[in-house]
């Protein structure tokens, strides 16, 4: 039994659905709904599919229950994501829906999905979503479509229609797709292909379009954002891209997935010199111990972790550092884990995500000896999160009394309270700021922080003090 069959067999009846991003499209002959699962890179794919459908004459509404077809853009990064995707598919199958399965699960298990889910009328790979209109037309003619290519070289640019699903003031901008690294635990290169970067000119044109739409925060994403341009220009060009984006009239530009080897002095200098580029670094370090990093096929990283973090702290004293770690990797001993705990306590990261190792078929780590028991993985995750919670709470308490810029994203109509984020919080993964006072949706306001909790802040809108920095520097 393969990984997908095991997952499907664990859902004899689907009852536990999860909150999903739901967007639907309709036209006279057939209606199509789109459900988005997974990461923000997957979200961009979803938004392009929606844009293409709208351009072809489909009408965007919001009801997949009455739709003739439901597109599910799936995730297959780890077992938990796969279970979420399969749960959604099985729920729709029980309802008798005609399902179009897109995204990473489709790329990973195309034949198995067609066999196990007869309600699937089409399978669309990660490099094929731009053909969604033609695929639906083929389905409507009675064809069962397998549109999964092994040539993963496509990346959408600013000319491909896009229907954004984020809050109005926030947009993600994908600067590259795919990954040239081969970490032993990661299936992404198999699902997304090797890195291919967009040109600086293409990225700037899309950023300008988003600025015209009123976007206040632009978030750069790719598998390894700090390696942007290597494949296209023969050298990293992130520093040049940062400076170029500094001329775009968007108040906040944030970068996610900044791998430590790419955080060069040139990149740090570009961040220093670009006022609207937030000093927020998301560094997916995965572990600290050299032996575990070697087993992860990241042997270079143990030599640069401390050096990069110290350089960032010196050059950008107000930098916000987020990272993620994997605990319970095969062969991880208590000594290795203690090394990680000490590393986290030493560097006092602002935000940390902790994942337990998920053995993925098709990766070298799946076959490694000395697999760690699930109970030990969970216990280590809890211990690390407990340590980090105290650090994050202390970092948040340091904000009390300060006046910081906050982007207002939601309003509670009953209380008039706003929910927003300061530069130290990225969407979805970090905390929020609860704000009292006057403002408008999608605006940036100065807020004095009055109270802190372990993950969130509370404050009051005030007048901007003299010399106030709208990027939180």
Swiss-Prot record:
Its cofactor is [4Fe-4S] cluster. It comes from Synechococcus sp. (strain JA-2-3B'a(2-13)) (Cyanobacteria bacterium Yellowstone B-Prime). GO terms for cellular component: cytosol. [4Fe-4S] cluster 2 binds at residues 179, 183, 186. HAMAP family: MTTase_RimO (MF_01865). Binds 2 [4Fe-4S] clusters. One cluster is coordinated with 3 cysteines and an exchangeable S-adenosyl-L-methionine. Keywords: 4Fe-4S, Cytoplasm, Iron, Iron-sulfur, Metal-binding, S-adenosyl-L-methionine, Transferase. It is an enzyme of class 2 (transferase). Residues 397-463 form the TRAM domain. It is found in: Cytoplasm. [4Fe-4S] cluster 1 binds at residues 39, 75, 104. Its EC number is 2.8.4.4. Residues 30-141 form the MTTase N-terminal domain. This is Ribosomal protein uS12 methylthiotransferase RimO. GO terms for biological process: tRNA modification. One of its GO terms (molecular function) is metal ion binding. InterPro entries: Elp3/MiaA/NifB-like_rSAM, Methylthiotransferase, Methylthiotransferase_CS, Methylthiotransferase_N, Methylthiotransferase_N_sf, NA-bd_OB-fold, Ribosomal_uS12_MeSTrfase_RimO, rSAM. Belongs to the methylthiotransferase family. RimO subfamily. Catalyzes the methylthiolation of an aspartic acid residue of ribosomal protein uS12. It comes from the Bacteria. It catalyses: L-aspartate(89)-[ribosomal protein uS12]-hydrogen + (sulfur carrier)-SH + AH2 + 2 S-adenosyl-L-methionine = 3-methylsulfanyl-L-aspartate(89)-[ribosomal protein uS12]-hydrogen + (sulfur carrier)-H + 5'-deoxyadenosine + L-methionine + A + S-adenosyl-L-homocysteine + 2 H(+).
């Amino acid at each position: 039994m393969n990984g997908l069959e095991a997952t499907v067999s664990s859902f004899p009846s689907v009852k536990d659905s999860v909150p999903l991003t739901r967007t639907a499209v309709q036209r006279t002959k057939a209606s199509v709904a789109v459900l988005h699962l997974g990461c923000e890179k997957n979200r961009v794919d979803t938004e392009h599919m929606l844009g293409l459908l709208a351009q072809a004459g489909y009408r965007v509404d919001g009801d997949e229950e009455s739709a003739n077809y439901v597109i599910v853009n799936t995730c297959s990064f780890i077992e938990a994501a796969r279970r979420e995707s399969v749960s959604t598919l099985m729920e729709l199958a029980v309802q008798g829906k005609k399902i179009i399965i897109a995204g990473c699960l489709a790329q990973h298990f195309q034949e198995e999905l067609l066999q196990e889910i007869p309600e699937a009328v089409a399978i669309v790979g990660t490099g094929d979503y731009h053909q969604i209109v033609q695929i639906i037309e083929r389905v409507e003619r009675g064809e069962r479509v397998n549109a999964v290519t092994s040539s993963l070289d496509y990346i959408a640019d600013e000319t491909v229609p896009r229907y954004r699903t984020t809050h109005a003031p926030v947009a993600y901008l994908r600067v590259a797709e795919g990954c040239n690294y081969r970490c032993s635990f990661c299936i992404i290169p198999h699902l997304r292909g090797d890195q291919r970067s967009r040109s600086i000119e293409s990225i700037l044109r899309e950023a300008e379009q988003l600025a015209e739409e009123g976007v206040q925060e632009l978030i750069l994403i790719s598998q390894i954002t700090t390696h942007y341009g290597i494949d296209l220009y023969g050298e990293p060009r992130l520093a040049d891209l940062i400076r170029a984006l500094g001329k775009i009239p968007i108040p906040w530009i944030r970068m996610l997935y900044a791998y430590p080897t790419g955080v060069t002095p040139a990149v740090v200098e570009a961040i220093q010199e670009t006022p609207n580029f937030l000093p927020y670094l998301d560094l997916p370090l995965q572990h600290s111990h050299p032996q575990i990093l070697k087993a992860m096929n990241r042997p270079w990283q143990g030599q640069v972790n401390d050096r990069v973090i110290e350089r960032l702290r010196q050059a950008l004293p107000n930098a916000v550092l987020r990272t993620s770690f994997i605990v319970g990797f095969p062969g991880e001993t208590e000594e290795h884990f203690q090394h990680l705990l000490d590393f986290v306590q030493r560097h006092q990261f602002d935000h940390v995500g902790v994942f337990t190792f998920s053995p993925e078929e098709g990766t070298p780590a799946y076959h490694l000896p000395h697999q760690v028991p699930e109970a030990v993985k969970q216990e280590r995750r809890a211990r690390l999160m407990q340590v980090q919670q105290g650090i994050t709470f202390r970092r948040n308490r340091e904000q009390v009394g300060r006046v910081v810029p906050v982007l207002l994203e939601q309003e509670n109509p009953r209380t008039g309270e706003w929910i927003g984020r300061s530069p130290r919080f990225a969407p979805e993964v970090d905390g929020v700021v609860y704000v009292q006072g006057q403002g408008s949706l999608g605006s940036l306001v100065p807020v004095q922080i009055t109270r802190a909790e372990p993950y969130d802040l509370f404050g009051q809108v005030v007048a901007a003090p003299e010399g106030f920095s709208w990027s939180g520097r």
